[in-house]
């Protein structure tokens, strides 16, 4: 048998603490996702072409460091476990890197700006990887109980949706307040605040969680063998495909969102109104995952259903705007976020279950390695989405802080509505084929506990 769960039930404080970990993640990565691209182009003064190239280049960097970090977490030995120590050490370092990334020097020559951008962004991505991979893997190490895992991921998603809502509501006003005389000062100050939140949340997560799934010591296993095992794990491959599509739709749209409100709607403050309208639906949507899972008993089918309706509601938004049809526009925004939040909970709840399936199928348990490729898949989707957006905007004549031409405005509009909408429907089709239901999962766990493998 590959693992043993000493205590299937997880204390409420541990579930809350785990949720706070994602609060921290979103106060860094969602800030980066939503604001970094427009910071680079409109504040730092870096060209769209350079930003697009960075997004693609950084994924080659991820392809190297994500599996390495995942493997290192699996090999970590400490009195705190395998994954928790990474939160304690890597979180404050990543917070500092976040601040450095948002330190703009618009007076520098273009080549100097690009070099600084590449170095700080790649270091930030590495730091975030050193926090996010062990954080994501930690859920599977806390319990093997499928219902408890669903509760933990619901806590994570609800906390994340609250954090995203708060961040989206307060960020533009904070940038205006602290950047009244200089936009670069505003971004730097906000980065300092969010960096502190990031570190504090992960300290709390470290302090109040516990790794209860015991993995016996095993001989060193090559990357080739681990990759071969992963390729035999069909539920995991579907989850990985879902994460790639998720990254493309989420981060591509997020990179566009401030451009959309600034240039298409003509008023960046609409973004704050939009954020206020989606925060409650976000929380409700995340909380709806568990009752729907109890009914369907298949996390993949739940994710598929949420993805389908996210796509349909997002496509509907193309026909309305905040300026002329505010009630319908914001209502559809709330509906879209409701379904998205349910999906977000479901897709992350799937991943720990795939670890047990892989262990049962191949005899190999490699939590961190598997989560590393989930993280990489999400980042690949992010890279393609953001690089494609930046490349198209640059190609068709985007000029920072100026009135944009019709083609550029059309790209911004479609990137906010139709393009992600279509890919959400594709995501729904992919995850519909996820077959690992609750009954089969529990049978697999029992076989592992009894030392049997089919």
Predicted region positions:
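Membrane-embedded alpha-helical bundles of multi-pass transporters/translocases
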Residues: 2-454
């Amino acid at each position: 048998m590959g693992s043993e769960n000493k205590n299937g039930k997880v204390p409420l404080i541990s579930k809350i603490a785990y949720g706070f970990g994602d609060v921290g993640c979103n106060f860094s990565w969602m800030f980066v996702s939503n604001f970094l691209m427009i910071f680079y182009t409109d504040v730092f003064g870096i060209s769209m072409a350079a930003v697009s190239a960075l997004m693609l280049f950084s994924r080659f960097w991820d392809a190297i460091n994500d599996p390495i970090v995942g493997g290192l977490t699996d090999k970590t030995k400490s009195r705190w476990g395998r994954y928790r120590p990474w939160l304690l050490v890597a979180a404050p370092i990543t917070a500092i890197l976040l601040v450095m990334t948002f330190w703009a020097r618009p007076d520098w020559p273009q080549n100097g700006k690009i070099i600084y951008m590449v170095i700080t962004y790649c270091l930030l991505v590495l730091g975030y990887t050193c926090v996010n991979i062990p954080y994501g893997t930690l859920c599977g190490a806390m319990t093997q109980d499928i219902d408890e895992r669903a509760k933990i991921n619901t806590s994570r998603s609800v906390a994340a949706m609250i954090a995203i809502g708060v961040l989206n509501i307060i960020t533009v006003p904070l940038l205006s307040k602290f950047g009244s005389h200089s936009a670069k000062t505003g971004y730097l100050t906000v980065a300092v605040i969010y960096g502190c939140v990031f570190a504090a949340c992960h300290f709390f997560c470290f302090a109040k969680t516990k790794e209860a799934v015991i993995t016996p010591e095993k001989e060193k296993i090559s990357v080739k063998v681990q990759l071969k095992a992963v390729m035999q794990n069909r539920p995991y491959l579907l989850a990985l495909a879902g994460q790639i599509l998720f990254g493309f739709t989420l981060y591509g749209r997020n990179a566009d969102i401030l451009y959309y409100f600034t240039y298409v709607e003509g008023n960046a403050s609409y973004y704050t109104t939009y954020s206020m309208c989606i925060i409650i639906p976000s929380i409700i949507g995340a909380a709806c995952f568990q009752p729907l899972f109890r009914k369907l008993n298949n996390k993949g089918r739940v994710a598929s259903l949420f993805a389908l309706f996210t796509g349909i509601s997002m496509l509907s938004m193309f026909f309305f705007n905040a300026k002329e049809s505010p009630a319908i526009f914001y209502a559809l925004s709330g509906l879209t976020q409701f379904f998205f939040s349910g999906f977000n909970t479901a897709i992350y709840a799937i991943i720990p279950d795939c670890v047990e399936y892989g262990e049962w199928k191949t005899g190999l348990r490699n939590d961190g390695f598997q989560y590393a490729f989930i993280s990489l898949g999400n980042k690949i989707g992010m890279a393609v989405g953001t690089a494609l957006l930046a490349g198209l905007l640059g190609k068709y004549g985007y000029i920072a802080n100026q009135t944009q031409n019709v083609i550029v405005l059309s790209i911004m509009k479609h990137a906010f509505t139709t393009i992600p909408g279509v890919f959400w429907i594709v995501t729904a089709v992919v995850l519909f084929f996820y077959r690992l239901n609750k009954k089969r999962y529990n049978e697999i766990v029992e076989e592992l506990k009894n030392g049997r493998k089919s």
